[in-house]
Amino acid sequence: MTMDGVFPLTATVDYCDIFLTHDSASVRKAHNTGWKHKMQVEHYYNAEVDPAKIQSVIDNVTKAYIDAGLPGFPELIAVGVNGQRGQPVGGPPRPPQPFHNGGRPGPPGRPPMGMFPPQRPMMPPPHMRPGLSQMPPGMRPPGPPPHGFMNGSMPPPLGTPVMENGPVAGQQSQAPVAPRIHPDRLRLAGNSIKSKLVIESIYCFYPFGCLDSQIATHTFLYHCANDS
């Protein structure tokens, strides 16, 4: 603060004709999240770039993703006039949806009228349970199943090797699923400079991801001028 009580104007803001009194990341972030700054950015791009040109760049990038078949790209669903979801763009066809004649369906597994299942048989008394009545007197009941077979399944026959913390030998194990990489990172990692310019421009304008970057602004304008 100066002697006359006025803060010095030391920092400028992109897209806005104002100055900040403090040049710090927190002050710039607080300014860039305001509605006035976003409105100035929108007016700046509407005055400098044709909206039809912006949409054509976005459509070209979207089509390039679909043609390349990159993993992790969100499928584009066409919505019909009746509100039902259509077929995904560039994907296999889906089976038709079942037709419901009004009303919500009943609970699953309920039998039709007059076809109720038979009643469950009565439980035998404790002294007549299966498996215990056939045992001779004075003999103790069998103990619990061995470790790893607590769900009631039968243990494998003798001689079958069992893997620790894994499936039984002879069964196929499920292959590990590779982590899905975002298509933007794949595109930026190994493609041409032109594609990188397109992705940078999309990040800069749609949505407002790097509003305080003059370099991304000039990159976007350069690509739009040389795209035709």
Swiss-Prot record:
<keyword id="KW-0694">RNA-binding</keyword>
<dbReference type="GO" id="GO:0030627">
    <property type="term" value="F:pre-mRNA 5'-splice site binding"/>
</dbReference>
<dbReference type="InterPro" id="IPR000690">
    <property type="entry name" value="Matrin/U1-C_Znf_C2H2"/>
</dbReference>
<dbReference type="GO" id="GO:0000387">
    <property type="term" value="P:spliceosomal snRNP assembly"/>
</dbReference>
<dbReference type="GO" id="GO:0000395">
    <property type="term" value="P:mRNA 5'-splice site recognition"/>
</dbReference>
<dbReference type="GO" id="GO:0005685">
    <property type="term" value="C:U1 snRNP"/>
</dbReference>
<comment type="function">
    <text>Component of the spliceosomal U1 snRNP, which is essential for recognition of the pre-mRNA 5' splice-site and the subsequent assembly of the spliceosome. U1-C is directly involved in initial 5' splice-site recognition for both constitutive and regulated alternative splicing. The interaction with the 5' splice-site seems to precede base-pairing between the pre-mRNA and the U1 snRNA. Stimulates commitment or early (E) complex formation by stabilizing the base pairing of the 5' end of the U1 snRNA and the 5' splice-site region.</text>
</comment>
<keyword id="KW-0862">Zinc</keyword>
<feature type="region of interest" description="Disordered">
    <location>
        <begin position="83"/>
        <end position="127"/>
    </location>
</feature>
<dbReference type="InterPro" id="IPR017340">
    <property type="entry name" value="U1_snRNP-C"/>
</dbReference>
<protein>
    <recommendedName>
        <fullName>U1 small nuclear ribonucleoprotein C</fullName>
    </recommendedName>
</protein>
<dbReference type="GO" id="GO:0003729">
    <property type="term" value="F:mRNA binding"/>
</dbReference>
<comment type="similarity">
    <text>Belongs to the U1 small nuclear ribonucleoprotein C family.</text>
</comment>
<dbReference type="InterPro" id="IPR013085">
    <property type="entry name" value="U1-CZ_Znf_C2H2"/>
</dbReference>
<comment type="subunit">
    <text>U1 snRNP is composed of the 7 core Sm proteins B/B', D1, D2, D3, E, F and G that assemble in a heptameric protein ring on the Sm site of the small nuclear RNA to form the core snRNP, and at least 3 U1 snRNP-specific proteins U1-70K, U1-A and U1-C. U1-C interacts with U1 snRNA and the 5' splice-site region of the pre-mRNA.</text>
</comment>
<keyword id="KW-0479">Metal-binding</keyword>
<keyword id="KW-0687">Ribonucleoprotein</keyword>
<dbReference type="GO" id="GO:0000243">
    <property type="term" value="C:commitment complex"/>
</dbReference>
<dbReference type="GO" id="GO:0071004">
    <property type="term" value="C:U2-type prespliceosome"/>
</dbReference>
<dbReference type="InterPro" id="IPR036236">
    <property type="entry name" value="Znf_C2H2_sf"/>
</dbReference>
<keyword id="KW-0539">Nucleus</keyword>
<dbReference type="GO" id="GO:0030619">
    <property type="term" value="F:U1 snRNA binding"/>
</dbReference>
<dbReference type="GO" id="GO:0008270">
    <property type="term" value="F:zinc ion binding"/>
</dbReference>
<keyword id="KW-0863">Zinc-finger</keyword>
<feature type="compositionally biased region" description="Pro residues">
    <location>
        <begin position="105"/>
        <end position="127"/>
    </location>
</feature>
<feature type="zinc finger region" description="Matrin-type; degenerate">
    <location>
        <begin position="11"/>
        <end position="43"/>
    </location>
</feature>
<dbReference type="Pfam" id="PF06220">
    <property type="entry name" value="zf-U1"/>
</dbReference>
